[in-house]
């Protein structure tokens, strides 16, 4: 079998690297090996890039398996991205079947919601008002929901006004013993009417969750700030110890309680984004830009085309990195920091976006590994003038090699997307210099070997 030159090069590349590392005298990369075939080891950062800001498609946001670390809830009023909202829809289930409410009278009802510090974004010194609504439309326990879906709501059943979220303040009002676990959470008072509604549900309808859900179709959790920029709060509804609705009632002169839990229930987040009049909104659909805009949740992604990649004939891609520089805009809010992680995705079929091979190589098939070998997180560097700048460096070595080897004219194979990760629980955004910026344009840094 005849081995191609490129295959031979890839096979011998580890040996080349070991040989170079063992030399005491510096030599050119690969000197002495394949010397008749390898012409040079080159660098360029001038490849043409076409960038287009696009609005995200809907995201699968159901958590039927109760594995989500948190859910976003709140409103952001961003000077460059407009207004973004996140509402939570959820079922509640009985903590145990067939509670005994015979001759019970209501004392009170409280909804406890645990905070997750990792997901908070914005200004937590701005007072928040959180509202709880009963659903008129059934939230199905056996269906998937997407981030653009809403369900019809009815009566407001609870409200906590003008509170300051304190996601770092840990306490435990349920267990005051010295060794008790502590967490940051809030207690939302629930109306007497809704508490009595729960008490009055027929005992037969509380023998199984599926029967109970026909009576309580679900709830919606929404929050609004007192003023800009507001904040996205992160609620860990799957913590059974600190997230539940507790019904306090009296029976036989004793005050008792019964819990309704989120854990084990279907729940999802709805995102809405109003870009009217915003800089980001005006950039949507444009592809010749000074500034680029990315946003998590159901926000914005970046489409990047490298149309002439296939014109690099007979090359081995040693390293390909997309370099993006964050832009500090006048009038921005310092609390709205750049996103912690960007990733590359590509189209599978016509509509589905999947992580690229370079991303998957770094984090592994379970998506639990480190991004160190891929990049995509903000780092501080010096520009040519010695000034500190913040950049993202994103590896696309394997993906770009596929572009180089591709046939001319297949623009789909030369197209990548940049998304904030993980999208449905990432409320942050990023403003980046675009391809037309005179000092810090987006660019592809390419190291390659000619054959």
What are the language-model segments listed below?
Residues 2-15, 20-451:
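Secreted, disulfide-rich extracellular signaling modules
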């Amino acid at each position: 079998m005849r081995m191609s030159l490129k295959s031979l090069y890839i096979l011998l590349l580890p040996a080349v690297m070991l040989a170079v590392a063992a030399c005491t005298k510096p030599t050119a990369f690969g000197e002495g090996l394949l010397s008749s075939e390898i012409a040079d080891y080159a660098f360029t950062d001038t490849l043409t890039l076409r960038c287009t800001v696009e609005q995200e498609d809907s995201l699968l946001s159901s958590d039927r398996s109760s594995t989500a670390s948190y859910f976003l809830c709140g409103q952001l009023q961003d000077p460059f991205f407009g207004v973004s909202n996140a509402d939570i829809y959820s079922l509640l289930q009985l903590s145990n079947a067939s509670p005994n409410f015979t001759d019970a009278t209501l004392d009170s009802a409280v909804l406890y919601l645990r905070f997750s510090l990792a997901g908070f974004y914005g200004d937590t010194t701005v007072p928040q008002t959180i509202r709880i609504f009963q659903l008129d439309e059934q939230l199905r326990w056996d269906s998937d929901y997407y981030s653009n879906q809403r369900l019809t709501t009815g009566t407001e059943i609870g409200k906590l006004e003008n509170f300051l979220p304190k996601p770092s303040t840990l306490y435990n009002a349920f267990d005051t013993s010295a060794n008790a676990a502590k967490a940051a959470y809030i207690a939302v008072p629930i109306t007497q009417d809704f508490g009595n509604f729960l008490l009055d549900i027929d005992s037969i309808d509380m023998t199984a969750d599926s029967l109970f859900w026909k009576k309580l179709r679900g709830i919606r959790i929404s929050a609004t700030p007192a003023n800009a920029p507001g904040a996205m709060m992160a609620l860990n509804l799957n913590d059974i110890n600190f997230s539940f609705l507790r019904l306090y009632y009296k029976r036989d002169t004793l005050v008792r309680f019964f819990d309704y839990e989120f854990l084990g229930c279907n729940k999802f987040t709805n995102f809405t984004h109003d870009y009217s009049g915003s800089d980001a909104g005006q950039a949507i659909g444009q592809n010749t830009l000074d500034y680029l805009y990315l946003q998590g949740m159901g926000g914005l992604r970046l489409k990047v085309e490298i149309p002439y990649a296939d014109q690099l004939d007979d090359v081995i891609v040693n390293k390909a990195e997309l370099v993006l520089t964050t832009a500090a805009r006048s009038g921005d809010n310092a609390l709205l920091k750049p996103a912690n992680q960007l990733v590359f995705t590509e189209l599978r079929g016509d509509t589905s976006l999947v992580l690229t091979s370079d991303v998957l190589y770094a984090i592994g098939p379970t998506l639990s590994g480190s991004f160190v070998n891929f990049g995509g997180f903000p780092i501080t560097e010096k520009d040519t003038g010695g000034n500190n700048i913040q950049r993202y460096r994103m590896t696309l070595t394997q993906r770009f090699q596929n572009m180089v080897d591709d046939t001319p004219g297949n623009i789909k194979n030369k197209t990548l997307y940049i998304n904030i990760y993980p999208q449905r629980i990432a409320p942050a955004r990023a403003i980046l210099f675009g391809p037309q910026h005179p000092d810090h344009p987006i660019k592809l840094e390419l190291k390659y070997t000619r054959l």
